[in-house]
Amino acid sequence: MSTEVSNESPVTVDEAEFAALARYVLDQLHVHPQAELSILFVDIPAMSDLHERWMDEPGPTDVLSFPMDELRPGRDDAPSGPGVLGDVVLCPEVAAEQARTAGHSTEEELLLLTTHGILHLLGFDHAEPDEEREMFDLQRKLLLTFLAGR
């Protein structure tokens, strides 16, 4: 699996940790080992621009996902095919504020948001209550098992 992590934000992040999380999540969801994923950390002005351009919403947001090849989770006996999963774009400065409100570290918030973004790339959504429950339960399970294995 090819995971590229780039930091264009003023906040220091452990790029290797986010690449490891991505590998873990994609392995757990049986995504083809040759799938490509990009994780990009940006500053507030860049995130505001992306948020307005792609979501028609003003101001920055915490995470945006840009799917490419519409890959879906596979199964033990049938992993997904290879392809370009897409891009997850995160704003550490927005995440830091959310982390303060939630009472945990910025890194934990960014790991949560990265997991959330990857699930969106795989077709998960939270527009409806049942979808939200499924996505957030899976997100929590994946993140907790990743953190427990560190």
Curated annotation (Swiss-Prot):
One of its GO terms (cellular component) is cytoplasm. Binds 1 zinc ion. Belongs to the endoribonuclease YbeY family. GO terms for biological process: rRNA processing. Single strand-specific metallo-endoribonuclease involved in late-stage 70S ribosome quality control and in maturation of the 3' terminus of the 16S rRNA. Gene3D superfamilies: Metalloproteases ('zincins'), catalytic domain (3.40.390.30). It is found in: Cytoplasm. Its cofactor is Zn(2+). This is Endoribonuclease YbeY. Keywords: Cytoplasm, Endonuclease, Hydrolase, Metal-binding, Nuclease, Ribosome biogenesis, rRNA processing, Zinc. It comes from Beutenbergia cavernae (strain ATCC BAA-8 / DSM 12333 / CCUG 43141 / JCM 11478 / NBRC 16432 / NCIMB 13614 / HKI 0122).
